[in-house]
Amino acid sequence: MDVKPDRVIDARGSYCPGPLMELIKAYKQAKVGEVISVYSTDAGTKKDAPAWIQKSGQELVGVFDRNGYYEIVMKKVK
C-alpha cells in the first residue's frame, strides 16, 4: 500500500457491527481526500466494510490480510 492513512481505527477484538460503525463515524468526521484505515480481527468486517464503502460512493483503496487481522483502507471522495 503506497497511500498513508490520515486516520487509523484500531478495532481489533471488536465484533460486527462495531468496526463498521467506527469506520462510518470516522468517515463523517473526515474531509474529502482523507484516507481512513480500519484494523479488524472480525471476518465479517472484511466483507461488510468494502460493501459499505462502495455503496456510499467512496473509494476502496484496498483490503489487506495482515498478520492476524484485516486492514480495510478507504478514501473519502465526496
From Swiss-Prot:
The family note in this entry says:
Belongs to the sulfur carrier protein TusA family.
Protein's name in the database:
Putative sulfur carrier protein Ta1170/Ta1414
CDD domains tied to this protein: SirA_YedF_YeeD
Q: Which Pfam families match?
A: TusA
Q: Where is the active site?
A: 16
In terms of InterPro entries, this protein maps to: TusA-like, TusA-like_sf
SUPFAM superfamilies according to UniProt:
SirA-like
